[in-house]
Design a protein with these regions (language model features):
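Rieske [2Fe-2S] iron-sulfur-binding domain
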Residues: 1-61, 67-75
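C-terminal catalytic domain of Rieske-type non-heme iron oxygenases
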Residues: 49, 54, 58-199
Length: 199
């Protein structure tokens, strides 16, 4: 669920069906009306951009391109070649929490050696933790942390010739506001897609 391909989309409410270009393909029983104009009832277009392998959508056609908004993040993450990473599995979780608290928690790794001492914190030292500065007009924040060279995960595969030196065992944690958060490691990537389920 949440991925794949199709040639059409069908609304689960009235069963109107749209082609992937947004044109209305079918609308059951609407031929019985005298004002139905299929050509005028397509989906509204949404601007879509691909940045570093991620698909970003915006309803605001006047907003600057994603690559411009995230320009100072690009040199930090492009060395990983994340656009070549592949999905291995997905999970869905429901948490009884305020999504903003989850975002705040994700944006700092100061807690890792304590709260996650049996997992990622076991191969991480606060002294090596670095944070990128967030300017007034920034649309993102990031931090990166270097794991010990003997860490069981988070290290580049021997055949990886993109990453050199300390970057072979350094992970980056970007947060693109308001809710795109992920861990980009030399050997894997995982992300959170937050969808608040009420107020």
């Amino acid at each position: 669920e949440g991925h794949g391909n199709t040639s059409r989309f069908t609304c689960p409410y009235h069963a109107w069906t749209y082609r992937i270009d947004g044109r209305l393909a079918a609308a059951p029983h609407m031929e019985r009306t005298n004002c139905f104009d299929r050509d005028k009832l397509g989906l509204a277009s949404v601007r879509c951009e691909i940045y570093q392998g991620w698909i970003y959508l915006t309803l605001d056609s006047d907003t600057p391109p994603v690559a411009v908004q995230l320009a100072s993040l690009t040199p930090v993450i492009e060395r990983y070649g994340q656009e070549h990473y592949r999905t291995i599995f997905t999970e869905e979780h429901v948490w009884d929490t305020n999504w903003k608290c989850l975002t705040e928690n994700f944006m700092e790794s100061y807690h890792l050696p304590v709260a996650h001492r049996e997992t990622v914190g076991a191969n991480f030292t606060v002294a090596e933790n670095e944070f990128g500065e967030v300017g007034e007009d920034e649309d993102f924040a990031f931090q990166y942390f270097t794991k010990t060279e003997g860490a069981p995960v988070g290290r580049a595969h021997p055949a990886n010739d993109r990453l050199e030196g300390v970057w072979r065992h350094t992970s980056v944690m970007p947060t693109v506001f308001p809710s795109h958060m992920y861990v980009l490691a030399p050997d894997h990537l995982w992300y959170l897609s937050l969808q608040p389920d009420g107020v």
